[in-house]
Amino acid sequence: MWIGVISLFPEMFRAITDYGVTGRAVKNGLLNVQYWSPRDFTYDRHRTVDDRPYGGGPGMLMMVQPLRDAIHAAKAAAGEGARVIYLSPQGRKLDQQGVRQLATNQKMILVCGRYEGIDERVIKTEIDEEWSIGDYVLSGGELPAMTLIDSVARFIPGVLGHQASAEEDSFADGLLDCPHFTRPEILEGMEVPAVLLSGNHAEIRRWRLKQSLGRTWLRRPELLKSLALTDEQTRLLAEFQREYQSEQQEY
């Protein structure tokens, strides 16, 4: 996968390209991230990249000419088929379904805003999609872009040690993940569930699915409303609810 990044602070992306799963993906040639800074497309000695908004008001906007030139340079490098994405609070909220959709793109250009944003005409002429990572304000689009890159990269074949890891992540099937345990078997008096030590893979799968359904019901019940549960899932959720309510009555 090829990703171009338009940012005033490309050095921030070393957190993605130099470390962890995404760092290995870059090292192994599975993920290629390139950068264009609008500052490199300025013509004044101060390398100005911000400008005052028409109509007044607080704050500045990114200057149009350097930003457009940076986007055009990235498009030229990408060639045909690259989607240009602006990280924006006004965009579609990123979720696992959106990540899967974005992961089908082989080429993307991510535009990271700064200041109060970018000129609306640039959005209309240069941007294909707008995406948001949540209903809150950040200082720029770099962190959302890194979030998008990290989440999408997990679906590139070969990036994860076991491709099932991406398929079993929280939200991969619309549910939260089940609890996980490692050694020791007993930690401060709390034991690993016996079923996980049993070696019975069918029972382990059933337990994990039930816990995933139950955790979603407890913590994110709105997610269940959008799912068409199978007969097995319906039974397991009801079983979890009965067990949970019984435990609550004991207290």
From Swiss-Prot:
Where is it mainly found? Answer: cytoplasm
User: In Gene Ontology terms, what is a biological process of this protein?
Assistant: tRNA N1-guanine methylation
Which E.C. number(s) belong to this protein?
2.1.1.228
List, alphabetically, the CDD domains matched: TrmD-like
Q: Where does S-adenosyl-L-methionine bind?
A: G113, I133, G134, D135, Y136, V137, L138
Top EC class per UniProt? transferase
Compartments in which it is found: Cytoplasm
Its UniProt entry gives the catalysed reaction(s) as: guanosine(37) in tRNA + S-adenosyl-L-methionine = N(1)-methylguanosine(37) in tRNA + S-adenosyl-L-homocysteine + H(+)
Q: Which keywords, in A-to-Z order, does the entry hold?
A: Cytoplasm, Methyltransferase, S-adenosyl-L-methionine, Transferase, tRNA processing
One MF annotation (Gene Ontology) recorded for this entry: tRNA (guanine(37)-N1)-methyltransferase activity
One GO term describing the cellular component: cytosol
Give the source's domain of life in one word. Bacteria
Task: Describe the task this protein carries out.
Answer: Specifically methylates guanosine-37 in various tRNAs.
Sequence similarity? Belongs to the RNA methyltransferase TrmD family.
Please give the subunit comment from the record. Answer: Homodimer.
Name of the featured protein: tRNA (guanine-N(1)-)-methyltransferase
Source species of the chain: Pectobacterium carotovorum subsp. carotovorum (strain PC1)
Give the encoding gene's name. trmD
